Amino acid sequence: QARRLLREAGGEAALVAKIERAEAIENLAEIVEASDAVMVARGDLGVEIGDAELPGLQKKIIREALLRSRVVITATQMMQSMVESPIPTRAEVLDVANAVIDGTDAVMLSQETASGKHPALAVAAMRRVCLGAERQFEPVEELKPGTHRLDRSDQAIALAAMFLAGQIGVRAIVALTESGATAQWLSRYRSTVPIYALSRSAAARRRMQLYRDVNPVEFDARGAGPTQAVRDAIRHLFVLGHLAAGDRVLVTTGDHTGLGGGTNTLKLLVLGADGIAEGLQDL
């Protein structure tokens, strides 16, 4: 119903379901499936179901979101002591880190930045802890043939890209995406390989800021054929300093640039000294 009302009002914003009631846990799978993203609202949820149950339910919500390829945000009192203190407690550090290790896409501050004494330090501390936790990366799930139901071409391409990234040693995955859908699929399969999502759509780039491991980059491929668009994209990342000569990268793209939902191609590239892609070959 919320999505219908949004569309009738002419809106295209993503729907984030805030999980904060016991009734939501009883219908968790249905809520996650109907949403674009979910938020683990630990304050109100803890009051509803009790402190002892909260850690396990946080992990359950994150797992359910990952299983259904939805974005998940973990929030509430993550660095509460920094409302007053310039440094977080060790317990808060572990709390944030464990949420990242469990697979959350984003962590959220509230009072720490809304009315706290050290808002910038709180953001810096959370960023530092998140980056440290990502270095302790362990895959949430193994990419094995037959373990994923693939309903769309972009989903299949994303799974193939993440599987290959773990097998052939690439520097990055580059997704030319109009809507950001391919980047979302890529972010569902955990990897240590950075993902650069190139899109001309400001709305898509803002949405992709929430996707784990995804770095949105402004890029307009309209007017270029598929092969030239790929070469231009790689050159663009080279100029920005994200890629270097000799890097091997995987690229996902479609036959028609500028159209959403058309990702159907996976390519392996090697960068030359000037950032021009060489050895282009379809996989």
Question: Which stretches of residues belong to each language-model region?
Answer:
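Non-catalytic helical/linker scaffolds that mediate oligomerization, partner binding
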Residues: 1-283
